[in-house]
């Protein structure tokens, strides 16, 4: 290391040419808010010189451009991009996302520690810096059937891995508040490290109790009022804009220069089609500035404030001694990355090609029994039926009640009120559970949509008008080893295979993007009105997000944390 330090000193002072010098541009100083005209000297993975002129062995002209620190996605599930970590790296790093803090609890719920190890192995090979948080709630609750169980004894061996950053989102906030021994054991083991939160709508003294355990960050705020209370109580708020959960607009009032030290950005769940059409964190930055947010506030949240929230003290500024994660932009407002450096390496196709591949895992994870149309029947009742109310752009659902029509001795859908059937089928080969219910808000007039992506236990979830089409869609998932399927009038009109744990494709992200475009069109042909019907479907079984959900064990009243049917 002493040789490296000597090199850093000599190149920083200018005694020797730097490895790389960016010349002729300006950099955005996130401390003062100034645009500073200066060369930027890089030695190895580190910035060694600013605010002066430098010579370099390689000099790159960035005249007319603005250089900012690399962007940090502070909470995401790479599995929701439907591609491997290697393909995610290739997809978003060119957009300026140089660090991603991921929670692999999707694959962990299916494969357990094998899934976590797959992510850690991948993170050691990617060009972007992928950091892994250890999945805290596998299974998420006792109200569903997962493919794995991760008690604290299975997590602690990973704690000191160089890519591990802490304990991932603690979703079981009722378990924390009610002092569940399993929850407390995990929290106790990670005292002094980073513990990520997940506390939708938690307020008042219950929030105090939750935070008293050492939890410091939260990405579930859906209103400025909720976010402000959590900031007052010492939390960093991770402003989220994913493919389904879109909270940026609601939280813009808190994205100010004064509050920016307590903010960061995240996507949580974002698929390659949305990344291709809109972008990633760069899309959030553009959107916020166009809506009137000060550039200094949003760029701080995208980098230095994010780094500080997670203890990544080596990155987030364009300054000597800091990690050379840099994005060369056309302008602050457009936030279009023209050049990206990750750890001092210029991001190119050739750089990606040098990565070592990681063998896929979980290629035979869909073990569901074959179902028939009759399995989707719901006996008729004259009393009101609980219906899951979908809110576009939200993973929070409403608990609605309706009198539904009789079809013989069965309860039928009510297309006039946009109410169709929903079912969850256990697919890990544990118990063969099957639960049926009703959902409002998808817009379907015919057919069915099915998925093995079903947060967080990732059982098969299917919505539809026709029970025959629902059965065909669910069974087709077994044949393709997991994925998404669209069925119309007895035939499959769209599908994507996700054979890695039933969650991720083996294909390049460009191919996944193109298939997703076709899938959306197939879903829209059924009448689907949701912008992202597949990921919206995937959140119907998530029993840690209010208010009504469905698991393989039945309908879940999340407010009561209990099965109700």
Curated annotation (Swiss-Prot):
It comes from the Bacteria. The keyword Oxidoreductase does not apply. Pfam families: Adenine_deam_C (PF13382), Amidohydro_1 (PF01979). InterPro entries: Adenine_deam, Adenine_deam_C, Amidohydro-rel, Metal-dep_hydrolase_composite, Metal_Hydrolase. Keywords: Hydrolase, Manganese. GO terms for molecular function: adenine deaminase activity. Its EC number is 3.5.4.2. Its cofactor is Mn(2+). It catalyses: adenine + H2O + H(+) = hypoxanthine + NH4(+). One of its GO terms (biological process) is adenine catabolic process. Transmembrane segments: none annotated. Belongs to the metallo-dependent hydrolases superfamily. Adenine deaminase family. This is Adenine deaminase.
